[in-house]
Amino acid sequence: MKIELAPSILSSDFAQLGAQAQQAIEGGGSVLHVDVMDGHFVPNLTVGPPVVQSLRKVIQVPMDCHLMIENPDLFIPEFVEAGADWISVHQEATVHLDRTLHLISSHGCKAGVVINPSTPVETLTEVLDLVHHVLVMSVNPGFGGQKFIPNSLNKIAALARMRAERKLEFRIEVDGGVDLTTVADVVKAGAELLVAGSAVFGHGDVRTNARQLLEAARTATFARA
């Protein structure tokens, strides 16, 4: 599958949010990752539908709204109306995951499920045929700039095996600590959607940072092949 970069605005300069998001896309980002945190499910507060709506005016690529919130079903319609293309929900935050994934799909969005570092991939067995993507958290959610958790590679590889064995087509996405030192291992393990925040934003030139990370990922793809 094609390797894609999903720049995460969590690490961007919010005073220049639209401009920096566009720069990351010009550098090769093909999905914009929007981290939504409620201060309850994770210990941080970020953005909501108004920011998504504003970004929609200037961003043409798909937006993946990663809902790190309690009771996501209550807010899914608002994010759809604001302009979300993909909506990713945590298995750990959803009592009836099957219902939630169907709700997302019923609104015409691509449904994704997210698992925290301590959650086994086997807990997703019954919903893998319902999702467009599975997002493996390779840090504990809540803050950007954390170090990559090495065991995440085993989870990515396990998902790749499950996908092949069941002849499914969901994408494998990874979020947390993805940078020039970790991206090759992540890709070789089987991930193809790469969320990157602090590796792209907050230092140097955003376009260059995105381009270099994507090039490193695609080089690793050739090595895997």
Residue ranges of each PLM-predicted region?
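Short, acidic/turn-prone active-site loops that include or flank metal/cofactor-
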Residues: 92-94, 116-118, 139-143, 198-201
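A short, acidic/glycine-rich surface segment
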Residues: 119-123
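Conserved beta-strand segments that form the floor/walls of ligand-binding pockets within enzyme
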Residues: 4, 114, 135-138, 173, ...
